[in-house]
A protein has these predicted regions:
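Flavin-dependent oxidoreductase catalytic cores
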Residues: 1-364
C-alpha cells in the first residue's frame, strides 16, 4: 500500500501520491464555459486526496473538434472558470492537467458550433473502409497542429500544472495513429512511426513555445470505440516503433488506456500496456482500466445498474514491482469522491459502490 501513496515527480512537478483521476466526459459546461458546479466536482476529488486531476476532454479551439454538447473549451470567455477550477484544485494540494481533445471521426454533420463543419480525419474514414468524414488536406493538418499548439500555450498561461493530449479511443490523434483510419500517402501516413508525426509535431512545436519544464502527457490505447479489437501495435517491436518518436518529440508521461488494467498486452508476459510502455520508453506511465471495480465500462451501455467493488491487491503488487508508476481511477471516483482517502485509511467497507446513476449524474 505504501507505494500507492509515495510522491512522484513528473518533469518538474511533484505529485503527493500515485493516483490520478481519469478524464471522463461530463457535458456540463454550457457554451463551453466551466461553471461553479464543474469547479466543485473537481475540488471534491482533490479534497479526497487525488494526486493528479486529469480533466474531462476539453475541445481544441477549432469548430471541427466538437462532438458532444456542453463540452468545455479554451475560448477567452472560459478563462475565469478555468482559473477558479485551477485555484480550487491546487488549494487542496493536488495538481491538474486538462485533457486536450479533438473528436476527429466521431463528429457528425449538424453538430454545434457550426453545423456545416464535418468531422475531420486523416483519410475521411471513421473505421477501416467506412467513409464518414472529411479527409484532411495538408493545409488542414498544418492548421490543426497550430490550433493544438496555441491551446497548449494558453493552458500553461492559465496556470495548469501540465497538459494531456487525448490520443486514444478513436478520436483525431488516434485516427492518425491507427492504420484503420490513416491511409495517407504523405509524411503523416504509412508505417507506424510515420503515423505518429501529427502528435509529434504538436509536441515539438509546443515545446519550442512553452519550454521543457511544462509536463506533457499523452493518452493512447490499442482499442477504439469503432473497433474494440483494433491494435496500433501487435508486438513489442511495433510498440517501440510507435513510442520512440513520441519520446524524442518531448513527451513526459504515457497514459496507456486499457479497459481492464489486469490484462496482459502481449503473449509471453504478464505486463499490461502501461508496463510494456514503461519498459520500452523508460518514461513514467499511468495505467487505467476498471480500477477498484469488477467489470469494465461496457456494462453501462448494456443496462448494468451497478458494479461490484473489487480489491486492489493485484494493482498494488504491480505498482510495488514498478510495472507502471501511476494509476488512473475513473468510475470509482464518480461514485465516491473520497475513494483515495478511504483506501489510504483502509476503510474499504465505507467505499460507495459504483451505480449507473452516478454516470447519469455526470452526463446529465
Amino acid at each position: 500500500m505504501k507505494s500507492l501513496f509515495k510522491p512522484i515527480t513528473i518533469n518538474k512537478i511533484e505529485l503527493p501520491n500515485r493516483i490520478a483521476m481519469a478524464p471522463m466526459t461530463r457535458m456540463m459546461s454550457p457554451e463551453g464555459i466551466p461553471g461553479e458546479n464543474v469547479k466543485e466536482y473537481y475540488q471534491r476529488r482533490a479534497a479526497g486526496e487525488v494526486g493528479l486531476i486529469i480533466t474531462e476532454g476539453v475541445e481544441v479551439s477549432h469548430p471541427s473538434s466538437s462532438g458532444y454538447p456542453n463540452v468545455p473549451g479554451f475560448q477567452d470567455k472560459a478563462d475565469e472558470g478555468w482559473k477558479n477550477i485551477i485555484d480550487a484544485v491546487q488549494s487542496e494540494g493536488s495538481k491538474i492537467f486538462p485533457q486536450l481533445w479533438h473528436v476527429g471521426a466521431m463528429r457528425k454533420e449538424g453538430m454545434a458550433p457550426d453545423p456545416k463543419v464535418p468531422g475531420y480525419t486523416p483519410s475521411g474514414l471513421v473505421n477501416t473502409n467506412k467513409e464518414a468524414a472529411h479527409a484532411m488536406t495538408a493545409e488542414d493538418v498544418e492548421m490543426l497542429i497550430e490550433c493544438f499548439v496555441k491551446d497548449i500555450i494558453k493552458i500553461k498561461d492559465l496556470g495548469f500544472d501540465g497538459v494531456e493530449l487525448h490520443g486514444a479511443h478513436g478520436y483525431l490523434i488516434d485516427n492518425f495513429f491507427w492504420e484503420g483510419t490513416n491511409q495517407r500517402d504523405d509524411n503523416y501516413g504509412g508505417e507506424i512511426d510515420k503515423r505518429t508525426r501529427f502528435a509529434c509535431e504538436i509536441i515539438r512545436r509546443a515545446r519550442k513555445k512553452i519550454g521543457r519544464d511544462f509536463p506533457i502527457a499523452i493518452r493512447f490505447s490499442q482499442w477504439k470505440q469503432q473497433d474494440y479489437e483494433a491494435k496500433i501495435a501487435h508486438t513489442p517491436e511495433e510498440l517501440e516503433k510507435f513510442l520512440m518518436p513520441l519520446v524524442e518529440a518531448g513527451v513526459d508521461v504515457f497514459h496507456a488506456s486499457n479497459r481492464r488494467y489486469w490484462e496482459p498486452e502481449f503473449e509471453g508476459s504478464n505486463l499490461n500496456l502501461a508496463g510494456w510502455t514503461k519498459k520500452i520508453s523508460g518514461l513514467p506511465t499511468i495505467t487505467v482500466g476498471s480500477v477498484g471495480l469488477k467489470s469494465d465500462f461496457i456494462g453501462l451501455y448494456a443496462g448494468e445498474d451497478a458494479v461490484e467493488s473489487a480489491p486492489i491487491d493485484e494493482l498494488i503488487n504491480r505498482l510495488d514491482a514498478e510495472e507502471f508508476d501511476m494509476v488512473a481511477v475513473g468510475r470509482a471516483l464518480l461514485s465516491d469522491p473520497e475513494w483515495v482517502k478511504k483506501v489510504r485509511e483502509e476503510r474499504y467497507d465505507e467505499i460507495i459502490p459504483f451505480e449507473s446513476k452516478f454516470a447519469q449524474s455526470v452526463y446529465y
